[in-house]
Amino acid sequence: MRTTRWLLATALLTAAVPALAASTGSFSTQRLSNVDKALSSDAFQGRGTAAPIEPTVIKYIADQLRAAGVQPGGDVVNGQRTWFQKVPLLQSEIVGTPEISLNENGTVLSLRQGTDLAVLAPLNGANRVDIQNAPLVFVGYGVDAPERGWNDFKGEDMHGKILVELVNDPDFEAQPGEAVAGKFGGKAMTYYGRWTYKYQEAARQGALGVILIHETAPASYGWEVVQNSNTNAQFDIVRENPGATHTELESWIQRPLAAQLFERSGLDLDKAKVAARSSTFRPIPLKATLSAHYAARPQVIESHNVAGILPGKKYPDETIIYSAHWDHLGNGKPDATGDRIYNGAVDNGTGVSELIEQARVFAAGPGPDRSVLFLAVTG
C-alpha cells in the first residue's frame, strides 16, 4: 500500500456543502430521493450484510457512482481497478435458543431472548458460551477516559464478572451545574458512549460479559431496534485476537427488568444513574449472578465495500474520504402485516444516496486538489 495521508470526512452534507454547491452546481433532492427509494425498496431485501442480495446491492451502488462521473477506486483485478473492495468479516450466529438466567439469593429467573434480553452471538471466536453464576457489578457508564479525568473502574478487578452498564456518555443526562456537564461534549455522543466501545473496554478490563441497560433516549432508538439488530447474525472485522476486543457475553437488557434487578439488590436504578455521573463513582456489586449457555457458529465470510474516486490534481496521494455504510438488517421478525423486510431508508439509504450525490457534484466541478474517495462500506 502506498503511503497516503488520510483526511477523514463524513458522508453527511455538512458545512462544506454550500461552498461546494456554489462552485460546482446544486445538489438534487430528487436524485437523493430516487436513490434512497431504490435502496430501501423490497427489491433490495433490506440489504443484509453478506446476504444473497449483496451482489445486486453493490452493483447498483457502483452503477450510480459510475453515472455520477467518478472512477473505480476498489481492488485491482487482472490489472484493472474495480469498484469493489473485498472485506473479510467474522460472522457469528447463535445456534438454537440461548439459556440465560439470573440467580438472586437462590431465586432463579429465566430471561427470554429478544423479550427480556438481547444476547449477541459471540464475536470472540468462540463456538460455545458457558457461564455459570458469574457475579454482576454495576460500573456506571463503563468508561476509562484518562484525558477527561474519568475512570469508572477505579482499579477494581473485573475478571470473571458481568458488567452492568449505562448507554451513552456520563454527561448525557447531566443537569446544569453538575460537575460532569459538558465533560464529554454534552448531548452529542462520543465514542465512549457507543456500545462498541463499552464491549471493547470491558474486554480490556478482563470482564466475562456485559449487560447494557437499554433506555430509548440515550440509546437513540427503541427496544425493537436492539431486538432486531442484536439477535441475528453478528459481524466484525477479522482480528488476530478477537478475545481482546470482545467478552464472552455481550447483551442488552430492558430497563424495567434492570430496575427490578437493582431493587432486589437494595438499590434504586435512578439514584444509581445519578451516582454514575460523578467522577468519584465506584463499581457497585449487585446481589445476583448470571448463567448463560448457548452454542454459536463462527465463520469467516467475504463481503464488499464499493469505492469510487476522483484523483487529485495537485496532491493525488492525499485522500479525503466520504463514507456511508450500505448494509442494513435484511430480513427479520415480521411486523403486524407479516412483512419481514427491514428496508433501511434512514439507516442508511439516506447516507448512501448523499454519498452518490456528493460524488456527482464533485465530478461536475473543476476537479479537487486532493483525491476524494467515495466509500460505501459493509459491516
Model-derived features with residue positions:
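Bacterial N-terminal signal peptides that target proteins for export
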Residues: 1-10
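Catalytic-core environment of secreted peptidases
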Residues: 26-73, 101-107, 157, 161-189, ...
